[in-house]
């Protein structure tokens, strides 16, 4: 047996392994996802169980976790979850590519009234949570019949021919948020029967609505005209689920023409079937004095 080329052979083997374990397009070292789809769902289930049991201390937060509710830094023990008597309905979407999972929970509060809580978790290795982003509506605007019986259509898996790619889904979401600034909708992005709901209140295809007022409108026409909002800044799309046709997006919507110039924290789940938006689930919270939604790391 000859050993004089062993060092070179070992180096070559290491190089080959390095190529195999690298991303040829980016040069980044390959690694398995910190938390897959089932893992992300399990982390969210555990979070919800801990919070409804009044045990926020059992949530596996990372040491430097960022926790916010309605854009404000908070301690978990001080969030609206402490008021939750029971979770009546929930839908959850996970994205192993980004490590994010989001749930919408229609809850019964301690006074018997309905509430709507959106929870986004960013999950790192070992199931540690680095982000907790809560968008919480406990106002009288929440429609119990909607949030306590969330539409199963959102979680339904689409047949392959009705799906868009991740890239196309995110692009659709970005066009929608751009329309909030330009007031020019892309009509082809919407199904003819598309509807938008704010904490359960139907905004589109009704004679009138108590949220935006004005004449009847569609998903597309509701973005047009001369609305008091725009621009939409801090746009993020933490969860994209191509299998279910889901895009979860967040943006800070400015109202520069309104006294005190409030801003709306917009948290939306888009259901996309056959390349068109069929339903939009929104939690829109008007706030004053908020400069940023956070999570800029």
Describe every region a protein language model picked out.
Residues 1-13:
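Bacterial N-terminal signal peptides that target proteins for export
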Residues 27-297:
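C-terminal and inter-domain tail/linker signature
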Residues 10-24:
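Bacterial N-terminal signal peptides
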